Amino acid sequence: MATVKTNTDVFEKAWEGFKGTDWKDRASISRFVQDNYTPYDGDESFLAGPTERSLHIKKVVEETKAHYEETRFPMDTRITSIADIPAGYIDKENELIFGIQNDELFKLNFMPKGGIRMAETALKEHGYEPDPAVHEIFTKYATTVNDGIFRAYTSNIRRARHAHTVTGLPDAYSRGRIIGVYARLALYGADYLMQEKVNDWNSIAEIDEESIRLREEINLQYQALGEVVRLGDLYGLDVRKPAMNVKEAIQWINIAFMAVCRVINGAATSLGRVPIVLDIFAERDLARGTFTESEIQEFVDDFVMKLRTVKFARTKAYDELYSGDPTFITTSMAGMGADGRHRVTKMDYRFLNTLDNIGNAPEPNLTVLWSSKLPYPFRHYCMSMSHKHSSIQYEGVTTMAKEGYGEMSCISCCVSPLDPENEDRRHNLQYFGARVNVLKALLTGLNGGYDDVHKDYKVFDVEPIRDEVLDFETVKANFEKALDWLTDTYVDAMNIIHYMTDKYNYEAVQMAFLPTRVKANMGFGICGFSNTVDSLSAIKYATVKPIRDEDGYIYDYETVGNFPRYGEDDDRVDSIAEWLLEAFHTRLARHKLYKDSEATVSLLTITSNVAYSKQTGNSPVHKGVYLNEDGSVNLSKVEFFSPGANPSNKASGGWLQNLNSLKKLDFAHANDGISLTTQVSPKALGKTFDEQVANLVTILDGYFEGGGQHVNLNVMDLKDVYDKIMNGEDVIVRISGYCVNTKYLTKEQKTELTQRVFHEVLSMDDAATDLVNNK
């Protein structure tokens, strides 16, 4: 690792007019922002519309994508790299911001390091044949992450995967959920960052197992920064030095991000806290007269269109879990500073304005860090844009700050907060871990550890429940044993996965844009949450009789009587939800995790709630799958799980009752996110548009200040979108943790989406009042 020399005059010129000094001595976007950002209290009236050039680029992107959807997407068979692939363009003469994922628009990259079988399957499913020479390398000579993982997997893990109790694990593709602070390239340039890595490498004096690994990782990060420089060179851009203006700042960030997208196909490739940094450059340029407002908006529009071109080669099996081809380019904005100042800037408005300028789209995943202390004009603008587009998600900074997520925190993937530059070394990145099916664990435990669908398949050891009527305390004790096995197995899988990922497919280019010494969250997830809670509630408050076959195997349940459901704002059942979340998290937290990670939990399913529903048998509160006589799975009666932390579709609560139930869940036990996806009818919010928007502001203020963490907000009537969704037309909606164009969903996923609750009243109290008044 060679010392890098940079002309100090370059920094003086690049940083002219910027305040503060401590961010100059060691890379820290957080400190730079604190010293330099300008809170904006005004409204959206300053915004500029699209240019003809922007609309032309948009047309090229959309027409190219449509063409490939009718034919096939081009795809590489060569192993991907950051800079050995030539530069690519959309329309070189008309682009303002350069850099795309490959040398051709929408050309898919071949990434075999996660697992050669999955990579080659993606090739074949896209209509291409693998290169025999590459196949030989990765089957005879090179070890993939998938190879390493399955060498180490325990028998418990294999049984859990086979039973679909533990599912969606990142054991054949990049793990994702790591966010580089890509604005570092813009503020400092690659030379500065490379020298900082040299200094960190040289500062390691003691040589032991941990320091040896760290020295190698720093070296890999240093090399990756060199590749980023080479990528810039391909486009005639010298990213060795810092950016001189907002256009270059956007350009440098795009080069850093596209370097990542060229070699890492994680389940999420988030952008981070970019708008507030760009706003500092923009304010300086506006004051200098370097660029006009229209020009700055055009740069943002061009950048966002680049982000919308990112696409990874996925298999059909992967698409079942993450439908609609999401890339999770989550872009976080607004929020609050530790000094009490809000962090809304004009650049936040500009990013949201792209929905109007270049059209509504799922990516980037626009995320507003919400607080009731944000300026009212901004909150009003956000709600009006959600009312119009249904493509923005909201996260509560008050709730997240209590768990140590600082003023420059951002959202990874879907709903998971991270604090990449946290100087206390907490929450810097996440080791992603998909989710486990807690309902299957409950049902399997009742059957003595035999799978709830395949009666002859033993998953784990536990005494079966033989009672004719299920007793709550007996079932709970049985379930706790199932949770012990489930969490132990889950931790083993995660430790193996992340050890092997670091060993065989280390994300050096992302890590190069982070502090050298970091600490990770290890993200564990739950699916089937509401059905599990409701099942326990039914057992406790109603009468639940197991229906057994001649061998005593439980294949169905008879539930008689009323019981409260999660989502109805009833403490009797909401307390069960609180218990389940805490019980799951505390079991995980008592384990030693890879690299001393911190155990976090998410209530999040993406579109995988449909896939998991198809792998789960009957419960006391829903119909699942069962086996035909020939052993095939019968899906004819299946009722789909609700997504994320959503209550069941059978819960009778209105939107406000739903919100109140979720507020009771302790974020301390779910640092990875508590995802609520809401569909609310405009008429439930008021008679006029202004009244509807104002009520949305009030509701989100109350939810987030009362302990809520996340809301996917869709403002729409089912009758207005049902036919469009089912007929495959373009409908942009927020689902569990991301945004999707519904035309890319499967028929089952479209059906599940339209079966969700579309709230036509805010509260069931409102419904009762309307009924009395004959409304």
From Swiss-Prot:
The modification Glycine radical is found at G737. It is found in: Cytoplasm. Its main location: cytoplasm. Signal peptide: none annotated. GO terms for cellular component: cytosol. Its EC number is 2.3.1.54. Pathway: Fermentation; pyruvate fermentation; formate from pyruvate: step 1/1. Residues 642-762 form the Glycine radical domain. InterPro entries: Auton_GlycylRad_Cofactor, Form_AcTrfase, Form_AcTrfase_GR_CS, Gly_radical, PFL_dom. The active site is at C413, C414. The keyword Transferase applies. GO terms for biological process: glucose metabolic process. One of its GO terms (molecular function) is formate C-acetyltransferase activity. It holds the Pfam family PFL-like. Keywords: Acyltransferase, Carbohydrate metabolism, Cytoplasm, Glucose metabolism, Organic radical, Transferase. The keyword S-adenosyl-L-methionine does not apply. It comes from the Bacteria. It catalyses: formate + acetyl-CoA = pyruvate + CoA. Several mechanisms have been proposed based on complexes formed with substrate analogs. After activation by the glycine radical, the cysteine radical, Cys-414, can abstract hydrogen atoms from the other active site cysteine, Cys-413, and from coenzyme A, and it can also transfer hydrogen atoms to product radicals. The other active site cysteine can attack the central carbonyl of pyruvate and covalently bind the product acetyl group. Homodimer. Belongs to the glycyl radical enzyme (GRE) family. PFL subfamily. PANTHER family: FORMATE ACETYLTRANSFERASE. NCBIfam families: pyr_form_ly_1. This is Formate acetyltransferase. It comes from Streptococcus mutans serotype c (strain ATCC 700610 / UA159).
